[in-house]
Regions:
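Sec-dependent signal peptide recognition
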Residues: 2-10
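C-terminal motif of bacterial Sec signal peptides marking the signal peptidase cleavage site
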Residues: 13-16
Length: 219
């Protein structure tokens, strides 16, 4: 088990450093640009970015990074999904940053590393599917939350108030959620799930992982 854990962490660290030590060198001259996109309701990322999303009108995207690196970052919408990925490897002292406004966000899908923070969610359903070692934070309100975490992800959604929550956590991931009514959770490997709220809990733990209740803030 220790060998598997060590290998998982090495893979995660490799993903996190992928754009830092290899590829086209950044110029060091920071530049911002606006990008016009079609409508989308989900975001998919591949790589290590620093992304801040606010659920509000109007839709907007601003990207900041070294001026010679920005053309290497693709932001395209397909089937209502905004895909953010690198067209080539590059080397920079800090990750490319994106600020995004979108009227309604229903899901985030990420592979690789980086940070992604979402605020202002208010809808009936929200989905998170992560593979790699990103740090994810989400806040707001939703009726149903689904979280699928693999690798060494760190996902904090305890400020996303949800009635019903489903969590499937694998690898060395850490997931925090808030569930008011029902929580169905499956843990595999040394992953860790922390929940708040008074939900009825159905849990399956395979291996040394754990499911832990934490008192809600202010209680």
């Amino acid at each position: 088990m220790k060998r598997i854990l060590h290998l998982t962490l090495l893979i995660a660290l490799g993903a996190a450093c992928h754009v830092i030590h290899d590829g086209v060198p950044g110029s060091g001259k920071l530049q911002k640009e606006k990008r016009n996109l079609g409508p989308f309701t989900s975001i998919s990322t591949e790589g290590a970015f620093d992304i801040a999303v606010v659920c509000q009108k109007p839709q907007d995207l601003e990207i900041e990074g070294d001026d010679n690196i920005l053309p290497l970052v693709s932001t395209e919408v397909s089937n209502n999904v905004l895909h953010i990925k690198n067209l080539r490897n590059y080397s920079t002292s800090s990750p490319v940053a994106l600020k995004i406004s979108v009227p309604d966000l229903m899901g985030i899908y990420s592979s690789g590393a980086g940070k992604l923070e979402v605020s202002g969610v208010k809808n009936d359903k929200f989905e998170i599917d992560i593979n790699g070692a990103p740090t994810i934070r989400v806040s707001g309100e939703t009726k149903a939350l689904s979280v699928d975490a693999k690798g060494a992800a760190k996902i904090d959604t305890h400020k996303l108030r949800a009635a019903r929550v489903e969590v499937d956590s694998k690898g060395v991931s850490t997931v925090e959620v808030y569930a008011a009514e029902q929580l169905d959770v499956t843990v595999s490997g040394p992953s860790h799930v922390i929940y708040r709220g008074d939900a009825v809990v159905n849990k399956t733990v395979n291996g040394p992982g754990s499911v832990e209740k934490k008192e809600s803030e202010g209680s």
